[in-house]
């Protein structure tokens, strides 16, 4: 009973519209404190979420539930997440091929969440989603996002956190706002394609956690991106235990 109560507290904390007071976010580095968090309709992220942004640096996405998950359950969840990731990789590979020479920064990789469960990280370069300086999805964005929405709808026991990033050009306030607006635009597109709002969350990180140097145009282009973390939801974890 105590375990379930602790899990419920973690879920409520993550689902808050402005969760900066939650313990899940206390591991943010100094620059991460400038990030903006957006609320999904229904308050989104559930038990399995907790991947670290930036490959081990930065902000916790969600709550740690620790010993509530055994090794056997972790293996079962890993099998399901591997299958979902492979399906998503195949779908998005078609987008790369169809796009030809256009900027098609699309990366699908396996990551771990804070509970050491397998999760999926999708990286989308801003050039395939938005026009420069805009938070309005471009027509080209449909090709990738429609496939991600389909994948999420086919795997209803997973949750997704959408995180927007910018380069360091311009003011911090502007970049924080733009990154959140872009994350929300992607989240709202997924909702429009039938993904339940209760499974989704959006967050803006601004120029935090760059993946390349902002000293060059190529590096800044890499830093302007949207990342989508797909993790095991509460029901998937319960079913696996």
Q: Model-predicted segments: where are they?
A:
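Periplasmic OmpA-like peptidoglycan-binding domain that tethers envelope proteins to the cell wall
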Residues: 165-238
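Amphipathic, membrane-active segments
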Residues: 82-116
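C-terminal motif of bacterial Sec signal peptides marking the signal peptidase cleavage site
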Residues: 17-21
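Short, low-complexity, glycine-enriched hydrophobic/amphipathic alpha-helices that associate
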Residues: 24-91
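Bacterial N-terminal signal peptides that target proteins for export
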Residues: 1-11
């Amino acid at each position: 009973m105590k375990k379930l109560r602790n899990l419920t507290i973690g879920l409520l904390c993550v689902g808050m519209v402005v969760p900066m007071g939650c313990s899940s976010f206390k591991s943010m580095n100094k620059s991460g404190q400038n990030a903006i968090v957006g609320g999904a309709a229904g308050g989104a992220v559930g038990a399995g979420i907790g991947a670290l942004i930036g490959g081990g640096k930065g902000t916790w996405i969600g709550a740690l539930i620790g010993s509530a998950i055994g090794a056997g359950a972790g293996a079962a969840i890993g099998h399901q997440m591997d299958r979902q990731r492979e399906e998503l990789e195949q779908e998005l590979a078609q987008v790369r091929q169809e796009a030809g020479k256009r900027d098609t920064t699309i990366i699908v990789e396996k990551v771990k969440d804070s509970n050491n469960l397998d999760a999926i990280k999708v990286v989308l370069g801003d050039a395939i989603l938005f026009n420069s300086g805009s938070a309005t999805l471009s027509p080209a964005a449909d090709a990738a996002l429609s496939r991600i929405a389909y994948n999420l709808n086919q795997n209803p026991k997973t949750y997704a956190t959408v995180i927007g990033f910018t380069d360091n050009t311009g003011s911090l306030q502007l970049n924080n706002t733009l990154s959140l607006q872009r994350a929300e635009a992607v989240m709202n597109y997924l909702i429009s394609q039938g993904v339940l709002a209760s499974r989704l969350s959006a967050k803006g990180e601004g120029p935090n956690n760059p993946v390349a140097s902002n000293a060059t145009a190529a590096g800044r282009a890499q830093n302007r991106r949207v990342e989508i973390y797909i993790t095991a939801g509460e029901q998937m974890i319960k079913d696996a235990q």
